[in-house]
Amino acid sequence: MPLTCAERHIFGKSAPISRICAVELTSVAHIREVGITAADMCAYAWHMETTLDGEQVLSDEGYNAFDEERWAPEPPKSKSRTAFERDRARLIHSSALRRLGAKSQILIAGTDDFARTRLTHTLEVAQIGRQIGALLGCDPDVVDCACLAHDLGHPPFGHNGERALADIAGNIGGFEGNAQTMRILTRLEPKIFHPDGRSAGVNLTRAALDAAVKYPWTLAEADRHPKGERSKKFCVYPDDEPVFRWLKIGAPQAAKPMECQIMDLSDDIAYSVHDVEDSIATGAFDPIVLADPKMLDHIIEQTRAWYGAKWDADKLLAAFMRLRREHLFPAHFNGSRESLAQLKNITSDLIGRFCWSVETATRDTYGPGPLTRYSSNIVIPEDTNYEIVALKGIAVYFVMAPREREPFHQEELKIVSDLVDVLMADSPLPSDALESQFLADWNESTNDNERLRVAIDQVASLTDNSALALHSILC
């Protein structure tokens, strides 16, 4: 029996079976009602498999109740929404997401009405992620959740603030924006509590939380990784490891699910395309300079210094040549409505170009059907990778690297460090500047290391403007 009109409205006219399986199927009658056959259920139901050595591991297809499980138990909810739709709603309504509106992307938040903030960047990542996820058969809400969550842990002043907090937290497990995201999702954002009274954060489903974990290893695992690929990034602090171990039950070690890989790529696409758009619109970058071979050499040199020598200079040059040859930079920009429209159309063309190339390459490798969770890996053609990095290099050369030479760049580091010092000044007595929720965490702490983590949590939660304002009052 085919889907009814109402069901098609809920699931979409071409919803993959894996999407439909996200709905709780409570009876044979309901299975028949939504038009899922026994063969469909066998093909796409998520289950545990036993390996040759007897180990229980996750199978690699679809979504089921295991993926909908939450870290803290919750009472049954209305069937009007899927578990993944609830995840997305919790993030949309979170204060952590709202705060991104006043946090820097590449230009200081609030200094230009055109340029993006972390929030607008996040929304654009989510739109791109949903598009790629739909092309590859993922549940769009799982991908959307990963995209909405991916920057929640960024402190004030972006990577600059991150570096300052990492230095301060060196002896207590470090600081990393992705690990802070995990902490926000599973502890700091107020929504759900464990039966024993501990905060469970927004308590996302396993599939949604797993999709948001971009670097699925601890700091200790990163430091001893033989390939050296994880030397700086990690996703969890020592006191948050229990939820990480629960999250990764049965998952391949250090592997990222397809939905997380889509989020990661969508972030790169949005960052590369939109930050160049901002650079052009604000006058930081004029594409005409790309006609100068010496300028291209300088940009490529800076790109490789920033992103690593693994990016071949000749291939980066070829990427710039392709983008120019195919008119994917505006020939002229003067701020008029017409030039803004041309710029916007070019950004749309670039996003479509990258999404199409990835879909084609991934489908060529894995074939049709839903590509979910640990069933597959996203395939990014080399030319696409180089074009994305070339665009990111433009933002580095014309915006990010010059900012690091500005006096205020060093001042940002000092502001973040000063705020932590003030909050810790009277330890074990709490500072009057601690917000209520962090004051409660402070009062539950038993030593200075725990209290330092609380101080870092509060400073990391600040926006650029609130950090400046608090510093002007306290320091």
From Swiss-Prot:
Membrane spanning residue stretches: none
Coiled-coil segments on the chain, per record: none
InterPro entries noted in UniProt: dGTPase, dGTPase-like, HD/PDEase_dom, HD_domain, PHydrolase_assoc_dom
One Pfam family of this chain: HD_assoc
Every HD domain range: 118-272
GO biological process: dGTP catabolic process
Keyword Hydrolase: yes
Alphabetical list of PROSITE patterns matching this protein: HD
Molecular function in Gene Ontology: dGTPase activity
UniProtKB keywords: Hydrolase
Entry-linked PANTHER family: DEOXYGUANOSINETRIPHOSPHATE TRIPHOSPHOHYDROLASE, DEOXYNUCLEOSIDE TRIPHOSPHATE TRIPHOSPHOHYDROLASE
Family: Belongs to the dGTPase family. Type 2 subfamily.
NCBIfam families listed in its UniProt record: dGTP_triPase (TIGR01353), PRK03007.1 (NF002829)
Protein name per its UniProtKB record: Deoxyguanosinetriphosphate triphosphohydrolase-like protein
Encoding gene, per UniProt annotation: dgt
